[in-house]
Amino acid sequence: MHELSYATSILNSILEVLKEQESLGKKVTGVSEINLEIGDLTLISFEQLKFAFEVIAENTLCKNAVLNTEMIKPKISCLNCGFLGILEVTDELEAKCPKCGSMNVRIKGGKEFNIKNAIIEFDD
C-alpha cells in the first residue's frame, strides 16, 4: 500500500508549512482543505490515500482537512501514425495508440503527485 507513504509525505509537507507560519508569529488553528494533482500512471487509489491520511493526521492540525484531487491524464503521441491525445489508463498497463494500435508511442505526464494548495485556518 504505497498510499500510506504518499499520505505521510502530504502530512509532513503541510505540517512543515504550518511550522513556518507559526515561526512568523501566526496562530494556526487547522487545515480545512488540501488540493492535490495526481497522475493516473501513479496508480494511487484515492480512496486508500484518503483513508491513510485520515488515520495518520488524526492528532494533528490536519485532522479535519478534506483531500481533493485533480487526476492528470497522461498524453500519448504515436510515432507510427502521428496520433496525439490522451492515454486511457487500464489495468493492463499497455500503452497502445488508440487509433492504429501501435506500441511505438511516447508518453508524457501522468506521473505527477503535487500538493496544489491548502486552506490553512488562522486565529484572528
From Swiss-Prot:
The record's listing under PANTHER family reads:
HYDROGENASE MATURATION FACTOR HYPA
Statement: the UniProt record of this protein carries the keyword Lyase: no
Q: Keyword annotations for this protein?
A: Metal-binding, Nickel, Zinc
- Gene Ontology annotations of biological process type: protein maturation; protein modification process
Q: Where Ni(2+) is bound, by residue? A: 2
User: What InterPro entries does this protein map onto?
Assistant: HypA/HybF
State the name under which the record lists this protein. Hydrogenase maturation factor HypA
- The entry marks the following residues as binding Zn(2+), namely 78, 81, 97, 100
Q: Which domain of life is it from?
A: Archaea
Q: What is the purpose of this protein?
A: Involved in the maturation of [NiFe] hydrogenases. Required for nickel insertion into the metal center of the hydrogenase.
Q: Isomerase: present as a keyword of the record?
A: no
Which protein family is named in the record? Belongs to the HypA/HybF family.
Q: Name one GO molecular function term.
A: zinc ion binding
A Pfam family (short name) is HypA
